[in-house]
């Protein structure tokens, strides 16, 4: 009986940690996607996994692009750590990729999803990564870039399904 109580307590604590991600909860899991844009048509996979006892959410992403007339095949890898800022408790993220980019994001809920919006000096490009839920097993994503003083323009659009 005591063992059952320990297991039940453990499962309840896991549920509480999962709920802590609020508007990001629909992203937790493993995903496979396809899409295209400026870099060409590609495919890849990504995951959002709680880590550090549920205190952070880690996104790992891999995108592969086949060769085209303009460029050889290539692969893009990135890692993002999502956390609650202290003391504001607002969701924030820091992003690193294989092209040596580092981007700090604030995270804002949007209709049926979340938007990661870069922060930085006015004379630097801005970035916006938006995930929109398309049901429990699918989502849409859009990555946009805005040169200094300009509006956002779509760089990549993709759709993903839960694995």
Which residues fall in each region the model found?
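Hydrophobic h-region of N-terminal signal peptides that target proteins for export
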Residues: 8-17
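Hydrophobic small-molecule pocket/channel-lining residues, especially in calycin-type beta-barrels
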Residues: 17-163
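Positively charged n-region of N-terminal signal peptides that target proteins for export
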Residues: 1-4
């Amino acid at each position: 009986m005591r063992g059952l109580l320990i297991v039940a307590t453990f499962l309840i604590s896991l549920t509480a940690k999962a709920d802590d991600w609020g508007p990001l909860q629909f992203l937790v899991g493993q995903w496979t996607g396809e899409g295209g844009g400026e870099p060409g048509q590609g495919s890849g996979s990504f995951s959002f996994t709680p880590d550090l006892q549920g205190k952070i959410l880690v996104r790992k992403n891999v995108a592969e692009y086949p060769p085209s007339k303009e460029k050889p095949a290539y692969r893009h890898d990135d890692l993002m750590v999502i956390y609650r800022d202290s003391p504001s408790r607002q969701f924030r993220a820091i992003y690193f990729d294989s092209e040596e980019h580092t981007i700090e994001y604030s995270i804002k809920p949007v209709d049926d999803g979340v938007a990661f919006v870069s922060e930085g000096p006015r004379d630097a490009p801005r970035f916006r990564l938006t995930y929109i839920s398309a049901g429990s097993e699918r989502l849409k994503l859009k990555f946009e870039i805005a040169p200094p003083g300009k509006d956002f323009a779509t760089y990549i659009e993709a759709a993903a399904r839960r694995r």
